[in-house]
């Protein structure tokens, strides 16, 4: 990782992998979607064979596979999954929005009705690792919101099934509609349905570039959570921070994939040098050191600022997915941070605490979109309808003002819809 010294007022230009596919990649995704729409299940079987090298005999996970998963999962792992589910559920219960109504003296009733989505599809990535935490973070808020129909897609392994931890987590959450599908073809199936796959109203969950491009392509026909890019971490630290902790946390995101971003922002050159050395030392023994090493080489940086105030400005410019504040008084700085998906305060709030266990959602805005976007929440799985009930008295009192506005905009039929009622009063 390179140390980059910033002058006071100097803007940061951080290289990120981005979310935009090439013309060829976009064309490939569009072809996959259209083929799934036309050929249904057969397209899913063909694409799974082509891209994953797996010959599917059944698109759906069976009850026998779910039962078998419990026989192959370690009990400490299962206990950890159950506790994580409980923590995430308790946090998201606090987010539930309630319908509300108010009645005015003239009899007008105004309000907002909150109702859950009918059907949601959760994409759970496979490939380089198993991700039961993705199931928890996507399914739990949907359940808290009241969604009744939750299905899941995840790419099958070469053995024709999914990892035991993935299946057991789904079973613990009561998700039994699970399709052995991944990639753009899985997104297309959830969006438009096939002979086997039921279409849904919203698709959530992370995936590779082709999954992200497919979600972007089907948006509008169905809802999506967000177009999530590679994982990011930014550590804001002062000279009191433990360089070993900081290095470990940077590596915790760098090991996700080669496009992950890992950044330190500090006014302390001494800390930056110590973190640089510590990162190299810890990287050498990581099982995924090739992946993490490429990420740090491409998208890693150690920024040294002229002051702590400038460091905070840099953080707000970056608008990172994960922000750790590793300073002597982290709470004192919290109010000055404007843009971050999740904020971890203090030396013991390591980013993996939020990834797996604490309760807040780990599906977060990336690529600087924390400037305007928020973490996945219960709100993402509900709809809000405005309720308007005008009384005769209210319309008589306000009808003239309504027609004035309608005619100002040149919409005569709007005005007449009010006039015809006023004439009957």
Curated annotation (Swiss-Prot):
Signal peptide segment: none
GO cellular component, one term: cytosol
Keyword match Amino-acid biosynthesis: yes
Protein name: Histidinol dehydrogenase
Lineage: Bacteria, Bacillati, Bacillota, Bacilli, Bacillales
HAMAP family, sorted: HisD (MF_01024)
BP term (GO), one: L-histidine biosynthetic process
First-tier enzyme category under EC: oxidoreductase
Disulfide bonds: none
Residues given in the record as Zn(2+) binding sites: 253, 256, 355, 414
Catalysed reactions listed for this entry: L-histidinol + 2 NAD(+) + H2O = L-histidine + 2 NADH + 3 H(+)
Protein residues bound to substrate: 231, 253, 256, 322, 355, 409, 414
Cofactor(s) named in the record: Zn(2+)
Family named by the database record: Belongs to the histidinol dehydrogenase family.
Amino acids binding NAD(+): 123, 185, 208
Keyword Zinc attached: yes
Source organism, top-level taxon: Bacteria
InterPro entries, sorted: Ald_DH/histidinol_DH, Histidinol_DH_CS, Histidinol_DH_monofunct, Hstdl_DH
Keyword field: Amino-acid biosynthesis, Histidine biosynthesis, Metal-binding, NAD, Oxidoreductase, Zinc
Listed GO MF terms: histidinol dehydrogenase activity; NAD binding; zinc ion binding
Main function: Catalyzes the sequential NAD-dependent oxidations of L-histidinol to L-histidinaldehyde and then to L-histidine.
Record-linked SUPFAM superfamilies: ALDH-like (SSF53720)
